[in-house]
Amino acid sequence: MLNPFGRTVLRVSLLIRLAQVAFFGALMFTFYSAIVPPALAVQLAPWDKAEHFIAFYSLTVLAVAAFPGGHLLVIAALLSGFGALIEFVQGLSIVHRDRDFWDWVADTIAIASALAPMLLVWWRRVVASGQKNIDI
């Protein structure tokens, strides 16, 4: 589609679809990286907790872009649950990885860190609009 200036304009629905593809791709990559032997996993950072933070911060941003109508707290709960699922699977003997509660904590902190600025923007809009009741 061309705008009046002759430039191609992407439709919002196409951008959402691209974000969904990116999100599910990142979700699968994260799960794969979590269950393969450490020697085969892609290393994003020298510290394990930093890798968890990077992965789940990115997943959160992609999830919000992919599901713009989604409730932020639901997105947070689902991603935190995904992090817990990864830790559960890593604890299975067939995976040959170690379950670590602190990995899940790093995942959840990353999710909260990604959502915090979004929630602040939302809060500013609520306060500026003078709404008396809010839907959390």
List the model feature ranges, each with a label.
Residues M1-W104, T108, A112-I136:
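Bulky hydrophobic segments
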